[in-house]
């Protein structure tokens, strides 16, 4: 339901806690933005993905018995994702929160299911095309940035659709419609065809040579080894399924490598991962403090934004605004957004580091790696960024299902700095531009970004 960074949630559960609460939540609820409608009956919820012309059932889920202060109801999908609902000011307004998200979603009571849901959109080439094209029209955030006339794209491709269009032809049509975006947070997946389509921003794919899976298995360790051999003093200590790594460059400089913001715990879902992260940070920052710290997210594939906020809290000396998140709120007007949902960085009372920091970034700093970088921008003293622009994808992925069972996703949110700046498409720029893992440097075992970081910290 709604969106979740680099994972798709297709079943949503909202239910009531106990008897008087059940009656207060029973009924139909529509999200502000996100294109979701929820039908609550007792302890069961049915979810629908809705556009102006289509309706696709999204699944069902059940209430779970978790009574936590501030929550009116807690619920769980069949996949194990946890959501909760809380009061929103009136009996016809609530707030829904996905535990892996840094923001909330407003839901409002409506009299009944939309008329378009009386008959779910059929699994035909025409029906699948309508769901795909309308969802993009109503939710994608970057048509103007990508200089795309979506209505024209739809008109051109609709003529290719007939009742006899094959699944392979349909996939190729959909892929061709969104290929020019070169947006890492867009994808199509067809398990029956064993096909999936996703892309990186042009010019940033140079680090990934060939298959993405092969790069993660062999390419990533090879690139990380360049830094380890040239600069790291002794073996790195590892936590959170090796996603958090820490060591020293020298007696004065700590080195924190964050490979992702997900997969921190094999059990316990998001909460289990947060517990594992906090324990790792306790261990790291309970050591004698170095004079300076290098944070390396040059290879970071994203995950859950709140984990990044938790790390930022260990580095903050005072409270500040990390970012404000908005989502497209109108199916026609691209300039209408949901009310801003601010995320604050509040200094943690647990062990941390308040001294000088340099952050290493690059084109494979992706998604939650970028929101983490954005969350560090307001920190005092300033964290100097060294490397290349990040990938330029910040929104959670709005996951959707087609009537034929295929999945697709797109970004529908914008993360804004306190002055309203967003970095979609271009990424966050470094303060000091240095090539990241250039072929010649990798071949010779050099890491010029790390060299520049140490030079800078030596003068702090």
Task: Kindly give the residue locations of the regions a language model identified.
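Hydrophobic h-region of N-terminal signal peptides that target proteins for export
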Residues: 11-19
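Active-site-proximal beta-strand/loop segments in catalytic clefts of secreted hydrolases
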Residues: 257-261, 296-300, 326-328, 360-364, ...
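Flexible, low-complexity junctional segments that flank or bridge functional domains
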Residues: 21-328, 335, 399-401, 456-459
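Gly/Ser/Thr-rich loop/hinge elements
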Residues: 302-360, 398-402, 412-416, 422-423
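Bacterial N-terminal signal peptides that target proteins for export
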Residues: 1-8
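Low-complexity, Gly/Ser/Thr/Pro-rich intrinsically disordered linker/tail segments
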Residues: 424, 428-460
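Extended C-terminal subregions enriched in glycine
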Residues: 356-378, 383-391
